[in-house]
Amino acid sequence: MNLKALVAASVGGLLISANEEPRLPAGWSRQATVEADRACTAGLDRSLAERGRRLLAIECTRGIDGYITVSQTIAADEYRGKRVRFAARVKADNVRGWTGLVMRIVSADQRLLGYDDMSTRPIRGTVDWRDTQVILDVAPEASTISFGMRLTDGAGKVWLDNLRFEEVAADDPSISINLRPVLPSRPQNLGLE
């Protein structure tokens, strides 16, 4: 066997391994804009883990216009008419743009019924471990609940640990972006004045 070919194959294999996308845990998926898909990685990370724990991480090595999300989607049946919380400990390193947890509730006909991506209280820069949560009401007509983490319009790295999804009491504050703006009941300014 040719020694040069063997060394090249071994080195090539190492390079491929070093550049592989981190593996997402079972049940989790990745969604990204085209630019973020090329510039960002998402998956399991043990670099900060204690006691052998795994962390979920997103890293964008260069600035992006767009987003990358790691999430999972579950059936809403068990949670209809209830208030739910997705919570995690979050750590951020040099996040330009912003990051945060995200939760989305959708009906069977794909109407958005509830949404919070922490855009009104974003995590930016370098932040040590922080307890973070999103809380939404699950409408009776809800079909699915998606929840996870997003990095938007920037670069940096963010980690999640101690993830929890649970029903909470009705008096826990829900933070939802207003999905139903007040609209006029009749057409306005059709004369373009």
PLM region descriptions:
Residues 4-14:
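Bacterial N-terminal signal peptides
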Residues 14-193:
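Extracellular and organelle-lumenal recognition/adhesion modules and their flexible linkers in secreted
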